[in-house]
Amino acid sequence: MAVLLLGEVTNGALNRDATAKAVAAVKALGDVTVLCAGASAKAAAEEAAKIAGVAKVLVAEDALYGHRLAEPTAALIVGLAGDYSHIAAPATTDAKNVMPRVAALLDVMVLSDVSAILDADTFERPIYAGNAIQVVKSKDAKKVFTIRTASFDAAGEGGTAPVTETAAAADPGLSSWVADEVAESDRPELTSARRVVSGGRGLGSKESFAIIEELADKLGAAVGASRAAVDSGYAPNDWQVGQTGKVVAPELYVAVGISGAIQHLAGMKDSKVIVAINKDEEAPIFQIADYGLVGDLFSVVPELTGKL
């Protein structure tokens, strides 16, 4: 058996955390080949080659892959699929766009958010907002799946995998790049951050979210938000943590003004230490918190920030 793993490449750089955790998840299935695709992907490929457990790295450099369009990447993967029994990717926003297309082109099912691999055909994935674990046995000749990287520790350094160039696939011509609107931030990326401070609807306004950002900056943390806060317009969509947002498992997760709806808990319950700040002592978030503080967040959070 052999595994083709799509590396997460953004602006020519490898998302090492997501890729290394995915390598750790699949390495027991057989030799792991990491595919790095982008307009500039050689540096990312060299980085992927250093990850322990990687047997080979393929690099596809072409302007076609420069704007993260799903259709060209899916076509590239399908063209390489013949040599592999398993095709996987970390469950990032990009991969969730690409992998279902790969599965459709191969006429197999896609397994999303795999949290454990029991054997070559059997996988576990969370369902019902993380309240149950589904065991899935696939009879497809090729398994296509995304990996819930929060469930795995990252593979270490020390790899010396060879890097080989591969030709770009033909452009399917189904979509074209128009423009990128990128928000610049000095904060760590949400899904790989060691610390996360998230705010909920209890903040009351977009302006009040500034106190969350100030605390996060003092902690060197990423900023997250509940779905309720995002839906209310208090925070941008890419900050959303939860079942329909991003899944995180940092060393420290601080939930401020978040009640603890099941949808939110599904995205952060694997955090190592959870701190909850809420004025409602009956809030469900306190049931999973390691540390809880009942109080007015508008008093407590600025005081905490001031003491850091």
From Swiss-Prot:
The Gene Ontology biological process terms listed for this entry are: fatty acid beta-oxidation using acyl-CoA dehydrogenase
Q: Provide this UniProt record's keywords sorted from A to Z.
A: Electron transport, FAD, Flavoprotein, Transport
Cofactor binding note: Binds 1 FAD per dimer.
Which cysteine residues pair off into disulfide bonds?
Answer: none
Q: From the Swiss-Prot or TrEMBL record, what is one GO molecular function term? A: electron transfer activity
Q: What InterPro entries does this protein map onto? A: DHS-like_NAD/FAD-binding_dom (IPR029035), ETF_a/b_N (IPR014730), ETF_a/FixB (IPR001308), ETF_alpha_N (IPR033947), ETF_asu_C (IPR014731), ETF_asu_C_CS (IPR018206), Rossmann-like_a/b/a_fold (IPR014729)
Tell me which CDD domains the record gives: ETF_alpha
Name the positions where FAD binds. 252-280
Q: Which domain of life is it from?
A: Bacteria
Bilayer-crossing regions: none
Q: Which PANTHER family match?
A: ELECTRON TRANSFER FLAVOPROTEIN ALPHA (PTHR43153), ELECTRON TRANSFER FLAVOPROTEIN SUBUNIT ALPHA, MITOCHONDRIAL (PTHR43153:SF1)
Similarity comment: family membership: Belongs to the ETF alpha-subunit/FixB family.
Q: How does it assemble?
A: Heterodimer of an alpha and a beta subunit.
Cited function: The electron transfer flavoprotein serves as a specific electron acceptor for other dehydrogenases. It transfers the electrons to the main respiratory chain via ETF-ubiquinone oxidoreductase (ETF dehydrogenase).
What name appears for this protein in its UniProt entry?
Electron transfer flavoprotein subunit alpha
Species this chain originates from: Paracoccus denitrificans
